[in-house]
């Protein structure tokens, strides 16, 4: 049993190490933390050569008309962005319902909150745009029930840390694949929000939908759940602004009952693409988004004409 004991020890060690770093980072003013994060990201740009090459290749597929200089400039900014995200995640517990508006602008969120107050349940389709943990944390501070799905991590200590962090803003976390997850998901949707991050090519049932003009395998499970439960859907993304604050953005809510899960998945992916085009340096281009996984491909992509528009942001009223 040495193996399980060692894994348990390592998991706890990771949790306490990350928690200690977070406690230290929480004491640093946000602008100072972002400055250190940019420096860390610049270092990563120079050191992580494999990730840099992959990111440059992927952004070249998405923006073939860009010059090499523009691609390199954007990917360098991407590394800096993710360096800042690390410090911001550590800093998140400083946000409260009283202080959130100082650092966060809400775009279109009030429409969804009013529908929740009227008894509607939602599936929130989200992506790794901007600081996605900032998005879930600040939506959690709005006072309506939010539950997010989380795939099991190899390092359980890190997963435990993220779950604890989200809980500070009232966000619940469900581990994907747990025996109780189907029941918990249905419960979460009733009068609340169930969130999925679904912009990556992972080992789960997926469909090919257009992403920057190329078919990309995208998880279909979130759309299936929305259709089967009769939930409404909304695309949720985050965007960092030049002044260091963030926008937590919900696009226009839409009905999922009776819809086609493939078309909904394509619609959501189009919404992600529109946000990425707004701030291309705030998405992880080192991810192999167009990787082929034939064993997980469950259907053919829809035609372009069948994909409804993603919608847009809207009111900036604080929810």
What name fits each language-model region?
Residues 11, 45, 102, 125, ...:
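A generic secondary-structure micro-motif detector
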Residues 117-177, 203-207, 214:
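Catalytic core of membrane glycerolipid acyltransferases/transacylases, capturing the structured
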Residues 20, 54, 110, 134, ...:
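Short Gly/charged-rich anion-binding patches and loops
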Residues 2-9, 47, 72-79, 114-117, ...:
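Non-catalytic C-terminal accessory region of glycerolipid acyltransferases
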